[in-house]
């Protein structure tokens, strides 16, 4: 199998991670992010989570910062949408995502 190179120490790569719940990114992309960092890739990571109130939000922030050790410019944002009611918050979630798109330009 041929290896896929997604970043290097010479060139920065901006990665957008989007999760609905506080551990979705870690479960879905954590291994890839850790491998890229361990391989010397220079990453700027924008980590967005839709739900994380109270203790879950604190846990999500701590976990994100732990995963992002070695990342040059991590940006972690935990929104406070109620994960039990995403379907009824569709408009608000889309507006939030649109506002994030104005400030984030991933590769």
Segments predicted by a language model, with ranges:
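Active-site beta-strand->loop->alpha-helix modules in alpha/beta enzyme cores, enriched
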Residues: 2-22, 26-107
